[in-house]
A protein has these predicted regions:
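N-terminal basic, low-complexity leaders that serve as flexible interaction/assembly modules and, when applicable
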Residues: 1-78, 82-84, 291, 299, ...
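Glycine-rich, aromatic-flanked loop segments that form ligand/cofactor-binding clefts
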Residues: 4-20, 60-90, 110-154
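Short, basic, glycine/proline-bearing loop/turn elements
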Residues: 29-41, 97-108, 246
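Active-site gating loops and adjacent loop-to-helix segments of metal-dependent hydrolytic enzymes
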Residues: 34, 86-101, 155-156
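Generic detection of long, well-ordered alpha-helical segments
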Residues: 44-45, 109-112, 170
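Glycine-rich, proline-tolerant flexible connector loops at the mouths of alpha/beta enzymes
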Residues: 62-84, 94-95, 99-108, 192-210, ...
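Active-site loop segments of alpha/beta catalytic cores
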Residues: 113-334
């Protein structure tokens, strides 16, 4: 995994999956019957146990910490709640320029110490050959949650603040970028060997808006971590943004399934590694289809050093475990 991040030759393609510890696993569902999602995230020993059991069961080549994108917003003053069936809700959204002043600078990470403890506990339980991946939400995705008050289909509140109140927008993004930078570095200091920046909602933007309103802040968020370790930069929903994602930063660019991997790599540039990009829905089919489609993605990488196999998004909740195991065995050549 580490060699692939650096585009060095490898014996085989490394593989791990976003949401590899999730609701499709019976073991995970049993844990969730006893504790809520955020309670699990804030219990370092239990969060590490969930991921360690997943790595052991699946045989993946990396362990991303069990956490969420949004806890970073709580010490910054956001009233965050995870509700059953509705997902994350922010009860005090930032809708106007004046509201941005309510978002506190993240000067110390004491309230996020549980995340660093998850990193340490996960690292302690793994073989040295399996790297730990820390992660954070990208400034744009975090800003969208802050403004919308939760997830959205159109991101209208976000875009209106961005277009109408540009100075306030950049102030908000500056604050978030500095916070994310500190957060990623703290995870590296705690023992993560790789970090991933998730820009889950950036695909709602066109290239020029991304370049003007997002790119400089994503670059700030990744800059310090990039000096220390591989950074995976992942966005979803709009392949036309790929060259700009590479321009913003990241030694590895995550690719979703909306573009062929070979085309994506050419757009990103061969000076970067790439991660992806099987459609998660393929895992809902049958083992023969999973095997065939996995080989198709591997073929698109054309044997070039620097491909990390992953899905184009997270494992879906109703995915059969045997199909996940088939994918991993296929990548490994078993």
């Amino acid at each position: 995994m580490m060699r692939a991040c650096r585009r060095e030759p490898v014996e085989r393609t490394p593989v791990w999956l976003m949401r590899q510890a999730g609701r499709y696993l019976p073991e995970y569902r049993r844990v969730r019957e006893k504790v809520g999602f955020m309670e699990l995230c804030k219990n370092p020993s239990l969060a590490a146990e969930v991921m360690l059991a997943t790595v052991s069961r699946l045989g993946v080549d990396a362990a991303i910490i069990f956490s969420d994108l949004l806890p970073i917003l709580e010490p910054m003053g956001m009233d965050l709640e995870f509700t059953a069936g509705e997902g994350p809700v922010i009860h005090n959204p930032l809708r106007e320029a004046a509201d941005v002043e309510r978002l506190r600078e993240l000067h110390d990470l004491d309230q996020l110490s549980f995340v660093m403890d998850v990193v340490r506990a996960t690292r302690a339980g793994l073989d040295d050959s399996i790297p730990v991946i820390g992660f954070a939400g990208a400034p744009f995705t975090l800003a969208s949650y802050c403004i919308e008050g939760g997830s959205s289909r159109a991101w209208l509140h976000t875009k209106l603040l961005m277009y109408r109140q540009e100075s306030a927008w950049h102030d908000l993004m500056d604050r978030l970028a500095r916070a994310v930078s500190r957060y990623l570095v703290a995870q590296l200091d705690a023992g993560a060997q790789i970090v991933q920046l998730f820009d889950s909602w950036a695909g709602c933007l066109g290239p020029e808006d991304y370049r003007r309103y997002v790119l400089p802040h994503s670059r700030t968020a990744m800059a310090e971590a990039s000096r220390r370790a591989p950074v995976i930069h992942f966005a979803t929903g709009n392949p036309s943004l790929l060259p700009l994602l590479a321009l913003a930063g990241g030694s590895v660019i995550g690719i979703d399934w909306r573009i062929e991997l070979g085309q994506a790599w050419a757009a990103v540039g061969y000076d970067r590694a790439v991660q992806g990009n099987l459609d998660p829905a393929v895992l809902l089919t049958d083992r023969d289809t999973v095997r065939r489609r996995t080989h198709e993605v591997l073929a698109q990488a054309a044997g070039r050093p620097g491909h990390i196999f992953n899905l184009g998004h997270g494992v879906l909740p109703h995915t059969p475990v045997e199909n996940v195991l088939e994918l991993i065995a296929t990548v490994k050549g078993d």
